[in-house]
Amino acid sequence: MAVQQKIRIKLKSYDHSLVDKWALRIIDVVKQTDAIIFGPIPLPTKSHVYTVNRSPHVDKKSREQFSFSSHKRLIEIMNPTSRTIDMLMKLELPSGVDVEIKS
């Protein structure tokens, strides 16, 4: 029984359209190398809410809330070749997308 290798790529950004665009671009690159792809799998969106006082001195009841959401996508690549890894390393991702790669 052969051991299958896999690479997990997790993309994270505050802009969902940016994450989706780059997930599809990674999939297009990997499809050229005949590797098996699972994804993009949408992971749960985390919402962060921060509450601050509007005034620095008085009116404790007057507050303002700021919120932002972080969007994540997961891509799994089964049986990657050296060509697959080379093509993934050549991709230049924008600064708004955080990439985490595990093998």
Swiss-Prot record:
A GO MF term: tRNA binding
GO terms under cellular component: ribonucleoprotein complex; ribosome
Protein name according to UniProt: Small ribosomal subunit protein uS10
Job of this protein: Involved in the binding of tRNA to the ribosomes.
PROSITE patterns, alphabetized: RIBOSOMAL_S10
SMART domains named among the record's database cross-references: Ribosomal_S10
Keyword entries, A-Z: Ribonucleoprotein, Ribosomal protein
Database matches in InterPro entries: Ribosomal_uS10 (IPR001848), Ribosomal_uS10_CS (IPR018268), Ribosomal_uS10_dom (IPR027486), Ribosomal_uS10_dom_sf (IPR036838)
Gene3D superfamilies found in the cross-reference section: Ribosomal protein S10 domain
Subunit structure: Part of the 30S ribosomal subunit.
Any one Gene Ontology BP term: translation
Family indicated by similarity: Belongs to the universal ribosomal protein uS10 family.
